Amino acid sequence: MSKVKCRYCKEKIDKENAFSPREKLYFCDQECYRKWRKTDDGQLDALLDYVWHLYSPSKQTSSTYVMIKKQAEHYHNVEGFKYQGMFLAVRYYVEILERLWCDDYGLGQVFPTYYIALQHMYEEQKALKEKLKTTTKSKDKVAIGSHNIIRRKGLSLE
């Protein structure tokens, strides 16, 4: 029996009993895998895996993988971007905006433009949620007629 090391807790486990979401990635169980996905290494892995599948099969080489990883680490270490934020920005670019992925530009076609735009959207959404918590619900019932608005409870429009 061969032994492998859990990526999260670093315990040695039997390869046959290990949880493996994909080739050469082993964990004690699904709980270790979930915890690992929340770490920087796990989030970087998710980003690299997602971006890797955006490239055309002819461009999926080891040098392309290294280039993607270096770009991601640069944006993380130098620019201060978070891996989870980068992952969401790439998904936003591809799935929501439906932009075509250009193999020649790599992550540079998404960062920093869309990362910063998403960051602002998130901050606005967070501020709106906070504002909603502080506002109270109005008890006035409003019925919309064909030509005008009728407020019940005897309220005037003045």
Segments (PLM) and residue ranges:
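Short, cationic/aromatic linear interface patches
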Residues: G85-S146
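N-terminal cysteine/histidine-rich coordination modules
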Residues: M1-A46
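Short, Lys/Arg-enriched, disordered terminal segments
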Residues: M1-V4, Y8, T134-E158
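Long, charged low-complexity interaction segments
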Residues: Q30-F81, N148-E158
